[in-house]
Amino acid sequence: IYGASTNADRDSSGAIVEEGSIGAFNMRVGDCFNDIGASDEVSSVPGVPCSDPHDNETYAVFDVSVTSYPEGEGMSELAFESCMQRFESYVGKDYESSSLDITTMYPSVQSWAQDDREVVCAVYDMNAEKLTGTAKGSAL
């Protein structure tokens, strides 16, 4: 079948060793992936080995602990603030002086109704340069 996406292959430690699709609910800390273009809802991302040039790296995955979906931009703000709190311990440099920025994936109103509570935090280069290697402990 042409054009069919395959899942990213992982080694025994869980690191991606061959590029392929990673489901939005299967993201792991340390996963590197490329951009998919502008989209409100993400079901999967193109995962790549971190040794290959890539756009983003997942540095935190967690469930939000609020009991109801925040109004307006509340979920976006909650996800970003929560990701900021986890940034320095992964990258090794505080957010304000880093050359990396944060992107988040978080529940939509629709996925919240299906018990989705997961937030994914990822870093990318502010100048839209490709990253090579892991951002973990890089102090970029």
Language model feature labels by segment:
Residues 1-140:
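Primary mode marks residue(s) on the alpha4-beta5-alpha5 output face of response regulator receiver
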